[in-house]
Each structure stands twice: as C-alpha cells, then as structure tokens.
Amino acid sequence: EIILLFLIEGYALDIIKFGIERRADGPGIDIGRQVSNAIKLLAVNIAYYLIPAIIIFVLGLFLRDWILTIISIILLIVFALANFMARCRLAKTDSLSDALAVGEAIGDISKVGIGKLIATVILVVIIAIVIMILAGIIGSINDLVGDILFGIALVYLIFFYHRAIGLLYSNV
C-alpha cells in the first residue's frame, strides 16, 4: 500500500513536470523514477511543514492565545504555498536542493502571483468537491458503480490538480 502511494506521488510529480513543459501527453510509468521522486517529495513535505511547526512551537513558549493563532495560520499558509512551489521546482529541475531552497520557493509565490495561486487552489478544490459529490450521489444508487466511479474520479482529480499546478508554474 505504501509503495502504491509512493508511485502515485511520484507520478504526480511527473504530471507537474509535463504541465510546466506544457506537454499535451501524459507521463509514462517508470516505477524506479517515481518511487525516487516520491521519496524526494516526502523530504520536501517534511521540511516545509517541520519549519513552521518548530517556529510555532518556539513562539508558543512566549506568545499566547489569539496572536499565536494568527501567526500560526499565516505561517502555515505561506509554507503550504511555498510547498506548492517547491514541488514545481523539484519537478522542473529534479534537484532536491532546489526544492529545499525555502527562500527561493517563497520568492516563486510572488512570481506566479499569490492571487493566481490561491484562486487556482480554490477553483481546483471546488471542482474536486463537485466531482466527488456527483460520484457520491451515483455511488449511493449502486455501490459497485460508485466505487468504480470514485476510483476513476480520484485518478482524474490527481491528474487535474497536479497539471494545474504545473501549468501555473510554467511561466516562472
């Protein structure tokens, strides 16, 4: 099961790369490369969520209540957006060090445009919700058809989401 998740994450990185390159085709399956990409993505995700967690923990020793909550939310949003950019940097360069360059990833947010980035994320989430609701409605009629449709919808959404991120980053 973990290997399958690694394959999906590695394939998603290839989808981002194809989006950045504005290629019309889809990436092929290369298990070795995709597992390697997934391990790199895991390192990137740990780094981009560990940094704000440590900062929030340290600030929590000194700050209390609402100010810590506001700072925490801002930090998590900034690092989540930077994580999007880090994924794109990893897909584009295949370099873990480029992806872990936090300052440059944060700088890429302004190159893409924070409004465009947030609007894309919101649009993708809305589309995903609509598709999953439709799959759920159909699934309530027939379990087997619903399960099959849910699987197809999930694969499509993974492809769509990562393609959108790649296309967004293609102008950087």
Regions found by a protein language model. Name each.
Residues 1-20, 63-99, 138-172:
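Selective recognition of hydrophobic, aromatic-rich stretches within alpha-helical transmembrane segments
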